Amino acid sequence: MATHRQRNHRLCKTNYQPNFRREKRTMNYGLVSKQDARLYAEAVCDVIGHGKANAAVLLCVETAAAETLLGDYKDPTPTSAGTGLTQVDLGTFEWLRDKYKNSRYAPVLLNQFGIDLSRTVYEELRTSPLMAMLFCRLRYLTVSESIPATREARAAYWKKYYNTSAGKGTPQDYIDKCQRAGVDALFTQ
């Protein structure tokens, strides 16, 4: 039986069905295929916004590539350095949940996805690519600077606002991991 969240999930409303035969290798963080990461990012951005340069979907998918190679890399520390497909840390999760739980986005998220931000718990990000993409997009939504149009500029943007000076990643790591994870192929299919 589908849960309330699954029944009200926008991708379910559009008769989207994951193709379990699409990729034979095991994915992590609840992802069935890399293509599904793009679909979740698109669904989230359809609700939250695509940004002025219409680059939010690219940024979210590239962030997932930089953080987990789009689900290919399983973090050996499931919650200490971040969790889920986009590796959101606990402090950031709590800040974003509290910031947006009474925002204009809250009723839309509840209607489209069945997500009540005020009741969301951190552990959900670990196995829900939808939740991971949502919190990734919410993190970037807090930034007043527009999302850049090029991958190189988005790499610097990711480092400054997402990975920050506390993170080990570099803009070059972002670019390299996007290539390793096959991000370009997701947008040419």
Regions found by a protein language model. Name each.
Residues 172-189:
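Long, charge-rich low-complexity segments
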Residues 147-168:
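C-terminal/domain-terminus segments
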Residues 28-43, 65-144:
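Peptidoglycan-targeting cell-wall enzymes and recognition modules
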Residues 54-62, 151-158:
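Alpha-helical scaffolds flanking conserved acidic
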Residues 4, 9, 15-47:
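N-terminal export signals and maturation junctions of secreted/periplasmic proteins
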Residues 67-75, 163-172:
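Secretory-pathway/luminal and periplasmic proteins that interact with or process carbohydrate-rich
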Residues 28-30, 48-59:
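Cell wall/extracellular polymer interaction/catalysis modules
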